[in-house]
């Protein structure tokens, strides 16, 4: 049942990535003995700005649906995707600093993706 008050899946995913980023960030700070309130506040501000950015996207979608603006695109989904990608990169960076062995496991895959983007032939 889809309610007016239901949270769209893209928002749930963006929020989940934000939570995982906070958790891995705290783990990294504890491991490196760098836990401090200033950095935590900056992280909270960043997450709050992402949430406001997502809300802005839904407001823009609403405006495009009800006011003829001459253009239409899925602003909220685009913004959620941007947030998810940004948070995923941050999570991977945090995990790499928490456990450097993970970098060794993921590096060949990332290198192959990079080569594929550059149009190089990848041997299997």
Where are these regions (language model features)?
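Membrane-proximal cytosolic segments adjacent to transmembrane helices
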Residues: 85-124
């Amino acid at each position: 049942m889809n309610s007016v008050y239901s949270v769209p899946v893209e928002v749930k995913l963006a929020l989940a990535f934000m939570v995982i980023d906070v958790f891995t960030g705290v783990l990294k700070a504890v491991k490196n003995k760098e836990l401090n309130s200033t950095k935590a506040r900056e992280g909270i501000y960043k997450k709050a700005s992402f949430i406001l950015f997502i809300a802005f996207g839904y407001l823009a979608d609403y405006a495009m649906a009800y006011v003829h603006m001459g253009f239409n695109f899925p602003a909220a989904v685009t913004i959620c995707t941007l947030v998810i990608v940004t948070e995923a990169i941050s999570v991977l960076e945090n995990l790499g600093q928490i456990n450097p062995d993970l970098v060794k496991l993921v590096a060949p895959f990332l290198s192959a993706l990079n080569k594929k983007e550059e149009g190089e032939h990848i041997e299997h």
